[in-house]
C-alpha cells in the first residue's frame, strides 16, 4: 500500500531523517520530481538524475563509513530508482511514490545509525 503522497508534492517534517545534508538533499529530490510533474522534459529529467546521483552517493558514503548493516539492500533500492530514471517512461506518479516510501521505510532505518 505505502504512505500517502503529499499534495502539493513537497518535503515536510514527516520526512526528516535528522541529518541536515540528507534532509536538504531530500528536499531537492522532492523539488525535482515536482518540476518533472509540471513539465516532463529532458532538462528536468536530467537535473533530477544529477541531483539523485549526488544524493545517493553522499548517502552511501555515510552508510559505508558507519558500516551500516543494511547498506547492500539500500544501495539496490538506489539502483532501482536510477535505472528507472535512465529508462524514463514518464511515470511521475511512480517516482513520487517511490521517493516517499523509500524515505519513510528504507531511509528511516538508518536514523541514529550513520
From Swiss-Prot:
Source superkingdom: Eukaryota
Effect of residue 99 to Y: Decreased auto-oxidation rate
Transmembrane segments: none
Keywords recorded for this protein, A-Z: Iron, Metal-binding, Oxygen transport, Transport
UniProt xrefs under InterPro entries: Haemerythrin, Haemerythrin_Fe_BS, Hemerythrin, Hemerythrin-like, Hemerythrin-like_sf, Hemerythrin_metal-bd
Binding-site residues for Fe cation 2, renumbered to this chain: 59, 74, 78, 102, 107
List of residues binding Fe cation 1: 26, 55, 59, 107
UniProt GO molecular function: iron ion binding; oxygen carrier activity
Family named by the database record: Belongs to the hemerythrin family.
Note: The sequence from one of the four major component variants is shown.
Subunit structure: Homooctamer.
PANTHER family: BACTERIOHEMERYTHRIN (PTHR37164:SF1)
The protein's role, per its UniProt record: Hemerythrin is a respiratory protein in blood cells of certain marine worms. The oxygen-binding site in each chain contains two iron atoms.
Name listed for the protein in its UniProt record: Hemerythrin
Organism this protein belongs to: Phascolopsis gouldii
Upper classification of the organism: Eukaryota, Metazoa, Spiralia, Lophotrochozoa, Annelida
Amino acid at each position: 500500500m505505502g504512505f500517502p503522497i503529499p499534495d502539493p508534492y513537497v518535503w515536510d517534517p514527516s520526512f526528516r531523517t535528522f541529518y541536515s545534508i540528507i534532509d536538504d538533499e531530500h528536499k531537492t529530490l522532492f523539488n525535482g520530481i515536482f518540476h518533472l510533474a509540471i513539465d516532463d522534459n529532458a532538462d528536468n529529467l536530467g537535473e533530477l538524475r544529477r541531483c539523485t546521483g549526488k544524493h545517493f552517493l553522499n548517502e552511501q558514503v555515510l552508510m559505508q563509513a558507519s558500516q551500516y548493516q543494511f547498506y547492500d539492500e539500500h544501495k539496490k533500492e538506489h539502483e532501482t530508482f536510477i535505472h528507472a530514471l535512465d529508462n524514463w517512461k514518464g511515470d511521475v506518479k511512480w517516482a513520487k511514490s517511490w521517493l516517499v516510501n523509500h524515505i519513510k521505510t528504507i531511509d528511516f532505518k538508518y536514523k541514529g545509525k550513520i
